[in-house]
């Protein structure tokens, strides 16, 4: 995808020559690092990793059968949260049984409208807030099947004339609909791009308008958050990332191996308990290891211990050592 296509949601329709020149300048400064195409049912999805002076970010575009396009823009930090949320939706979708005809009819045409435009029953919903951006995730169904609807809205602020409707400073939202059968493929492709191009230096969003993801200064309504970090043990790497959503502040701990990735999310109110549990187990394991070393030492014969345990053993050496100390 060309930068001109994937960057069009960043206020390209701003009025006046100066707005156009600023838009073109931003486009020229943006580099595309990687692109992945997914064909799911009759739709095409593009995942593009881009970079500008503010950092790296991911653009997601849906191209329908008629060529219509919808785009979302995610910081690397928000993309990581999306990846984990997708895992939750995948698990929920796998537990759902088949829909009955009555449920499908109710989901698609409660008001008699029928067809794809009618109301749709939400099976699971989540949302994220990142300063001037909001992301809504809804697992829904209609007569064509189940799908994940992802909607992004951007508040440009009172001083921005976006020219896209919705009131002063408010840009109309962008929405993509991902067929449920493609959730795993989409999640895996996103995870691969994050693994290959994400990093500690990409916590900020390269999106302009003061938006930022997790990490210091990116806590949205919660203000500044601690920086993420990582540790490497053998072939594993553990990432610690602090974020926030509608439920509050949380710590996401991700375990990453070359062919495996898993994560847990710990709410802020449980950090102290988790820390206390880790410290307690660390101390207990130290005591267990010391007892095991003592038992192994006791099993050894006098010769294996160095021959200097008994009261008379090595006495000459002890006297010599004492004399040296006295001489000093």
Curated annotation (Swiss-Prot):
Compositionally biased tracts (Basic and acidic residues): 24-35, 289-303
Region (DNA-binding): 27-260
Keyword flag Phosphoprotein: no
Record region (Disordered): 1-35, 100-124, 289-328
Amino acid composition bias (Gly residues), ranges on this chain: 9-18, 304-317
Keywords: Acetylation, Activator, DNA-binding, Nucleus, Repressor, Transcription, Transcription regulation
One term under GO cellular component: nucleus
Superkingdom of origin organism: Eukaryota
Keyword Acetylation: yes
Bias (Acidic residues) ranges: 318-328
GO biological process entries: positive regulation of transcription by RNA polymerase II; regulation of transcription by RNA polymerase II
Residue positions, PTM N-acetylalanine: 2
Molecular function as annotated in GO: DNA-binding transcription factor activity, RNA polymerase II-specific; DNA-binding transcription repressor activity, RNA polymerase II-specific; purine-rich negative regulatory element binding; RNA polymerase II transcription regulatory region sequence-specific DNA binding
Cell compartments where the protein resides: Nucleus
PANTHER family linked: PUR-TRANSCRIPTIONAL ACTIVATOR (PTHR12611), TRANSCRIPTIONAL ACTIVATOR PROTEIN PUR-BETA (PTHR12611:SF4)
Protein purpose: Transcriptional regulator which can act as an activator or a repressor.
Family: Belongs to the PUR DNA-binding protein family.
Name of the featured protein: Transcriptional regulator protein Pur-beta-B
Gene expressing this chain: purb-b
